[in-house]
From Swiss-Prot:
One of its GO terms (cellular component) is cytoplasm. The keyword Cytoplasm applies. Belongs to the SeqA family. Disulfide bonds: none annotated. It comes from the Bacteria. It is found in: Cytoplasm. The lineage of its organism: Bacteria, Pseudomonadati, Pseudomonadota, Gammaproteobacteria, Enterobacterales. One of its GO terms (biological process) is regulation of DNA-templated transcription. This is Negative modulator of initiation of replication. Keywords: Cytoplasm, DNA replication inhibitor, DNA-binding. One of its GO terms (molecular function) is sequence-specific DNA binding. Pfam families: SeqA (PF03925), SeqA_N (PF17206).
Length: 180
């Protein structure tokens, strides 16, 4: 994997062509340029380009200002629409929120627990210790585990708390919770 330096305007343009959460900059550029690795051999751009000039690291495309757009794209995605169970939609939303801002997600989940239950933990065992019937599942693409034997209303409440903590607009929170 190589890194390249791009200005903010170009980065925003590339980011605006994101089709799904977690899509890499390489995937976006390949699609935009209609380029596939199998169709053309890699050729150096110039012999004068030196590795020391390559400064910026390639980032996953999810800038803070596009987090609302990213959540809306999740709701419109085929992957989300194909989920028949509320628990699967719940896990997809959690994965997306984590990918947008893992620090804010961590802060939100630390303050989220019931009177007698812990909802999120770093390992399955912690959740099982707080209730034998919790049915913990790992949130895909994250280090978090979440209990899943709660009713849909509780799952919505958990997502609402996290999204409010991450400062999403109220109408988007309502829309997301309505789809779970």
């Amino acid at each position: 994997m190589k890194t390249i330096e791009v200005d903010d305007e170009l980065y925003a343009y590339i980011a605006s062509h994101t089709r799904h959460i977690g899509e890499s900059a390489s995937d976006i550029l390949r699609r935009m340029l209609k380029f596939s690795a199998a169709s053309q051999p890699a050729t150096p751009v110039s012999k004068e380009v030196r590795a020391s000039n390559v400064v910026a690291e390639a980032k996953t495309v999810a800038p803070v200002k596009d987090k609302v757009r990213a959540v809306r794209e999740l709701l419109l995605s085929d992957e989300y629409a194909e989920q028949k169970k509320a628990v699967n939609r719940f896990l997809l939303v959690l994965t997306t929120l984590y990918s947008l801002d893992n620090k804010a997600f961590a802060e939100a989940t630390e303050s989220l627990h019931g009177r007698t239950r812990v909802y999120f933990a770093a390992d399955e065992q912690t959740l099982i210790q707080n209730g034998n019937q919790t049915k913990p599942k790992q949130v895909p693409g994250t280090p978090y585990w979440v209990i899943t034997n709660t009713n849909t209303g509780r799952k919505r409440s958990m997502v609402e708390h996290i999204m409010q903590s991450m400062q999403f607009p109220a109408e988007l929170i309502e829309k997301v919770c309505g789809t779970i």
